[in-house]
Amino acid sequence: MIKKKTLLVSIFFFLQVFFLDAYGSSKKVDEKINSEDKLEKKYFPTTNVKGSLFFTIGALSESTSSESLHFTYENKIRLNTSFKGTDNLLTVFESGNALDSPLMLDLQSKKGDNLKISTLMYKFQFDDEYEAIIGPKMFGYQGLAGKSTAYNERIAILDGSNYTTSSGIGPGIGISKRKKNGLNASFKIASDSSQIDNESIHFISQIGLTKNNFGGTITTNLNKKFEAYGIATFYRPKNFPSISASIEYKDMDSGKTIKNWVLALQQALQNKKIGIAVGTYNSEEKIGYEGWSEINISDKFKIIPVFFVRENYQLSHELGFSINTKFNF
């Protein structure tokens, strides 16, 4: 069972954030109903289709295995449908053959060669501040209002929210609030299975601050098997690389506590972005280093070289390199 004290704190947080100013907000909502209704009546549903295709060719060098080249792909098709202009029904179809790839890059897909739905969710607004999300298939981080990093963690091997937003792929429902001063808060119930029960359910809560050049979040993730807590922050100075840092702790039901941390820099240049980072990449707290560059060849075509080093269980190092091409359509 999730610790009662922690759950009560999470519920108290939820009530404070979302209902404290409910009375003050109700009048503003009522005043907008008539004008919004008129706009919705004139709005015709629209659907936009976008896609991305990654080719990844790379190799991994380690002392315990022979070197070889690996060539994989990831294909995603995104359908965004809006019924009244302030909502979005997102459907993502995905395929990819990187299940056996030793590179284990975030931009690789392990879904298999058959096109499958990987995300299906509906997002809608109550007013200018409140937003809700619901769907049968989504990731734990989707629907959270806060911005935790200025670094692109969707390319290589490091991720600063491995535990605090990890709920697998499954159903979820959440509500979030964004204020004009940058403060935000989110509460989400998610599951890693279509059968939602005490074993699979996750309670994810987050508070944060997002400004143009700095921000951060505090996030918790409560589950029967673990409780995770994390803090993340970023700063984007002018004419210098952005700095992002995060640390999170995962308390297992076995009594073991593991941590995950990332320190990263990212810089935008004339036609490219460059990023470097160091941090832990697995539950054994092994250290990894990564560097990448995203080079814009055209609006629809990018080349992304990736280089990484990671410690393994034999106290040696794995050296990896890949050339990735991204096509947008």
Model-derived regions: residue spans:
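Classical Sec-dependent N-terminal signal peptides that target proteins to the secretory pathway
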Residues: 2-24
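Beta-barrel outer-membrane channel/assembly domains of diderm bacteria
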Residues: 22-132, 159-189, 199, 208-210, ...
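Short, solvent-exposed beta-strand-terminating loops
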Residues: 94-96, 139-145
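Outer-membrane beta-barrel and related beta-rich outer-membrane complex signature
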Residues: 103, 144-148
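Residues on the solvent-exposed faces and adjacent turns
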Residues: 136
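A short alpha->loop->secondary-structure connector
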Residues: 148-156
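Detector for outer-membrane/organellar transmembrane beta-barrel domains
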Residues: 180-185, 198-288
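Active-site-adjacent "lid" and substrate-binding segments of diverse enzymatic cores
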Residues: 192-194
